[in-house]
A protein has these predicted regions:
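Short beta-strand element of the alpha/beta-hydrolase
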Residues: 68-78
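Catalytic histidine-centered segment of alpha/beta-hydrolase-like enzymes
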Residues: 333-342, 346
């Protein structure tokens, strides 16, 4: 008995050591925001917090150098993105108090006891409004800014249309519009590029999973599409050619998520995220569903983005009615301008969004 206990303890100790040396083990404590001398900024916030939102425990990271700054609610795409800030700093926390919320079923908010099919679009929209209300109350601000990325834009724009009085402005990064048409355009692009490259293996994989307006996206297509896009530099980031090295490893070595939370990041990614709503996403034309908004609207889009179509987002921008609107093309970005071109993103937010202007926007 003692020998078995000693053996188990030794295995646990070795396992713990390997986790530490690999960088996977972490305390999960948010890093403080400090000055040049390493002293914590007195008015700053850097914390992980959990709330009961519409009956479900949900988590978020709050970061800001001064709690009196404007509040920015950041709504992620297919999976939470806060961990990326350790490798790809955004600087958002220097201008805003940023709420990196892990929405229902994702990351900190993942709950294996809640079946994905029970999570509805209506719940996502209601949760966005509940988080906005929490932030408004906690930081004593009448309104917050809402920034959404990729799949998050599908929910966020509908929340803005429903309750514009809660928000100063909406920033859509890689805005979804007509996602089925976006997937069809991407499929045609990928087939053309891999045929030109003479990559018959990838070409066969793509041709085995054709995307059509009539039949949608077949089983297995999205995994092939992701690998094909990243090889061409038109996936998550223009300079990212592998999800493993560009996303998975940064998530597993993040110091601000515990090991268990890191595992929940990926469980949520594969079982919840946008996928339970994929059929609804493909069937929805947001340009028809939300033809106008009552607050300033800003679209940030990478020209190399083939996850959410750049041309379709621009067409929507041209047609949508808003009191102020601006479209910003990022020439060095694919799907994630805030991580790929953070300085320009921050300048747009600081100079245009906060002032309700479009001086830095694209010109005809």
């Amino acid at each position: 008995m003692l020998r078995r206990f000693t053996c188990a303890a030794s295995i646990a100790a070795v396992g713990g050591l390997l986790l530490r040396r690999s960088g996977v083990w972490s305390s999960g404590v948010p890093l403080p925001l400090t000055d040049a001398d390493g002293h914590r900024l007195p008015a700053s916030v850097s914390e992980k917090t959990y709330l009961d939102l519409n009956g479900v425990r949900q988590g978020m990271f709050l970061q800001g150098t001064d709690v009196k700054n404007p509040v920015l609610l950041y709504l992620h795409g297919g999976m939470p993105e806060f961990f990326l800030t350790e490798r790809y700093p955004t600087g958002l926390e220097t201008v805003f108090t940023v709420a990196w919320w892990d929405r229902r079923g994702a990351g900190l908010s993942y709950d294996a006891q809640v079946p994905p099919e029970q999570v509805t679009l209506e719940q996502h929209v209601a949760d966005i409004l509940a988080v906005a209300d929490y932030l408004r109350d906690r930081f004593d601000q009448e309104k917050v800014y809402l920034m959404a990325h990729s799949g998050g834009t599908f929910f966020a724009l509908q929340a803005v249309a429903r309750a514009p009085e809660r928000f100063h402005a909406y920033i859509g990064m890689s805005q979804m519009v007509r996602q089925l048409e976006s997937e069809r355009l991407t499929y045609e692009y990928l087939v053309t590029r891999y045929r030109e490259r003479g990559d018959l293996r990838m070409l066969r994989r793509l041709e085995a999973a054709p995307v059509t307006i009539r039949d949608g996206t077949p089983d297995g297509y999205l995994s092939v599409r992701d690998k094909a896009m990243h090889r061409l530099g038109v996936g998550t980031m223009h300079d990212m050619h592998s999800v493993i090295t560009g996303v998975f490893l940064p998530s597993m070595t993040s110091q601000q998520y515990t090991v268990g939370e890191k595992l929940r990041l990926w469980r949520g990614k594969f079982t919840t995220g946008v996928m339970p709503h994929w059929g609804q996403v493909l069937a929805t034309d947001l340009s028809e569903q939300v033809p106008s908004v009552d607050i300033p609207l800003y679209f940030l889009h990478g020209v190399h983005d083939y996850t959410c179509s750049y041309p379709l987002a621009h067409d929507y921008y041209e047609s949508v009615r808003a009191p102020v609107k601006g479209f910003y093309t990022f020439l060095q970005s694919a799907h994630s301008p805030v991580f790929e071109e953070p300085e320009r993103t921050l300048r747009i937010l600081s100079e245009d969004v906060l002032s309700g202007t479009t001086d830095l926007a694209d010109r005809p």
